[in-house]
Amino acid sequence: MRRTLVYGLGESGEAATRALLQRGERPLAADAASGEGPRRVLEELGVEGVLGAGPEVLDGVDRVVVSPGVRPRDAVLREARRRGIPVISEVGLGLELLGPGVRVAAVTGTNGKTTVVDMARHILRVAGVAHAVAGNSWRALTGCLEEVRRAGVLVLEVSSFQLHHLPPPGFEVAALLNVRPDHLNWHSSFEEYARDKLRVFGGQGPGDLALLSADDPICRRAAGGLRAEVVLVGEGETGVRDGRLLLRGEFLAGERELGFAGGHNLKNALFAAAAAARLGAGLEAIREALRGYRLKPHRMQVVAEEGGVTYIDDSKATNPAAVAAALLSLGGRPAVLILGGSEKETDFEEVLPHLGGCRAVVCQGEAGPRLRDFLSERWGGEVVLAGDLASAVEAARRLARPGDAVLLSPGCASFDQFSGYEERGEAFARLAGGRRAVRG
């Protein structure tokens, strides 16, 4: 019997190990760490395991299923490549175990993929189309295989980490929303990152659908070489014209009818509508769903209003492109911007043209000093350095004036102070002194 190593025992690694056990296989489970988390997984599963694993764990192994948190430069993965041992992602294993018969719409992109998946599932729910959702920000695919088989339709969010080790998947629908510099501490270069994003179109044929952003240069260059039917979202018959959202020339909704704002979110809605339509949602259901949709938390969400100042949680903005989109969506409203978090060494050059409406920028967290130095040199406005989010909110409160927004759009991950962007957003809401608002 083939011997599979599951390497990395986070949520996806645990789910992959369970799925293999349910198939009657006896995988080897391993993690480079040796802490309580991986140890608990091994005890619960009762599977052979190795903690503090090094390259020797590959002895007798025929393939490796790798968790997305493991970087390609990891010693075990380097040795696997040297030995010619196949390496696949947990998503790749999930697709293999699913087998044929499930229609899959896969969504990737630097920004917006979780929102597009959430919009698509909302549309499918309103349309009465049975479906399941998995991947990246959702459940591990290998942890919900039976549900996916029963539904027959899967909306799958895939990250560059998951695509890096994914064989050509042949998705019926593949969507690439945008490609901006991000995760360069994981990928060896931006070029590798972009190549991994484009792997979402691997294995597609003329009967499949490829959705790409019309205004993203990498998407436009890639579109001409794809075998699937290509729709460039944001121009022509699938775009926004005179404040009207159109899908293949059919009217969906006016901007003012929607419960969310921002050009990036309108485009997200078009991606979701195009994918859902291919999976069986009718036009009337799409129209109804979009008019009733509200964004998930931590995406340009108003969390407090105090003294004429509005506090906006955009904690999900973990790269510079997302910060630029957030500032653009303010429409020139004066703002105090809170930037910073854990360091990813990303270039904030593309944020500079959008700082015109900012009264000040507060830089905080691990990346704070670098961002302070960058902005002090390249931008003429007021720049303040704060040690952490709490002191950043206090500084922003002092700087803001009635009518301003205090915008948490960090452009960085959160792991210097928090377990994730959700915890960071909740902390911001508490520090701002308000409850979460219901609007957009």
Curated annotation (Swiss-Prot):
GO terms for molecular function: ATP binding; UDP-N-acetylmuramoylalanine-D-glutamate ligase activity. Coiled coil: none annotated. Its main location: cytoplasm. Its EC number is 6.3.2.9. ATP binds at residues 109-115. GO terms for biological process: cell division; cell wall organization; peptidoglycan biosynthetic process; regulation of cell shape. This is UDP-N-acetylmuramoylalanine--D-glutamate ligase. It comes from Rubrobacter xylanophilus (strain DSM 9941 / JCM 11954 / NBRC 16129 / PRD-1).
